[in-house]
């Protein structure tokens, strides 16, 4: 499953793993959309292997036990895991998100 998540996370400059109906997922994808980022979005509750991918994302976010909070949204920029909502929003407020998006080729501003 780790290889599958890695492959999907690298398919575009920005990849977001979400679940339908998740308000934090909507907040992150809305922010990226307002920044004119065309992210690949994978809704895990609509993926055949979504539960397994969610466990892998939790492991990546919170360590080997995979416990510590929700696994979605999980945001990858340039193939690297950035984090969840709090990390992405904090980076945006600090002015760090846009430069990272530019470096990954997700923005042309």
From Swiss-Prot:
A motif (Responsive for interaction with TGA factors) lies at residues 106-109. It holds the Pfam family Glutaredoxin. One of its GO terms (cellular component) is nucleus. Residues 2-108 form the Glutaredoxin domain. It comes from the Eukaryota. It is found in: Cytoplasm; Nucleus. Disulfide bonds join 22-25. Keywords: Cytoplasm, Disulfide bond, Electron transport, Nucleus, Redox-active center, Transport. SUPFAM superfamilies: Thioredoxin-like. InterPro entries: GlrX-like_pln_2, Glutaredoxin, Glutaredoxin_subgr, Thioredoxin-like_sf. The keyword Transcription does not apply. PROSITE patterns: GLUTAREDOXIN_2 (PS51354). Belongs to the glutaredoxin family. CC-type subfamily. Has a glutathione-disulfide oxidoreductase activity in the presence of NADPH and glutathione reductase. Reduces low molecular weight disulfides and proteins. This is Glutaredoxin-C13.
């Amino acid at each position: 499953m780790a290889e599958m998540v890695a492959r999907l996370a690298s398919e575009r400059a920005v990849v977001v793993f979400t679940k339908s109906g998740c308000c934090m997922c909507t907040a992150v994808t809305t922010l990226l959309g307002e920044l004119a980022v065309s992210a690949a979005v994978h809704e895990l509750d609509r993926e055949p292997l979504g539960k397994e991918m969610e466990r892998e994302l939790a492991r990546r976010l919170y360590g080997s036990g995979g416990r510590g909070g929700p696994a979605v949204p999980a945001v990858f920029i340039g193939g690297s895991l950035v984090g969840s909502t709090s990390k992405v929003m904090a980076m945006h407020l600090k002015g760090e998100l846009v430069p990272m998006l530019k470096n990954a080729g997700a923005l042309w501003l």
